[in-house]
């Protein structure tokens, strides 16, 4: 992990970073993110570059170093470009539609599933079988997309369900009769 931690984070134009005793606020064109980091990792901002320095080479510090760097980089990318996860639905009668900020899913149950958009997350439904989840916080985008997928994850015999775009679902062979 320490090799990741040693990489320099390039700060794009229009992104401002405020470090107040390891509580880092990143402001950009898409929004603002704030997060508290480990006090042992020193965060230095010089011009358009950000570096992280760890106090020693213990295994714990190396892992925290790499994780902190990855989280900071995700914050910078999130406020400048944003994150997007796309899902697709396969199955007869499987549909998605937007009702305000709610996502209403018909996925073969006796009732419809409603997913409320968390703060900072927007849903887009291009057609009834494709959903995109967008936001500036990579963790929340991923968790929301994973929750939507978990409502009807792809089954292994016909592949029906909600999956990520490009996800490969290995299909099993059915029972062979006598």
Curated annotation (Swiss-Prot):
GO terms for molecular function: rRNA binding; structural constituent of ribosome. GO terms for biological process: cytoplasmic translation. One of its GO terms (cellular component) is cytosolic large ribosomal subunit. InterPro entries: Ribosomal_uL6-like (IPR000702), Ribosomal_uL6-like_a/b-dom_sf (IPR036789), Ribosomal_uL6_a/b-dom (IPR020040), Ribosomal_uL6_bac-type (IPR019906), Ribosomal_uL6_CS (IPR002358). Coiled coil: none annotated. Gene3D superfamilies: Ribosomal protein L6, alpha-beta domain (3.90.930.12). This protein binds to the 23S rRNA, and is important in its secondary structure. It is located near the subunit interface in the base of the L7/L12 stalk, and near the tRNA binding site of the peptidyltransferase center. HAMAP family: Ribosomal_uL6_B (MF_01365_B). Part of the 50S ribosomal subunit. Belongs to the universal ribosomal protein uL6 family. This is Large ribosomal subunit protein uL6. It comes from Streptococcus equi subsp. zooepidemicus (strain MGCS10565). The gene is rplF.
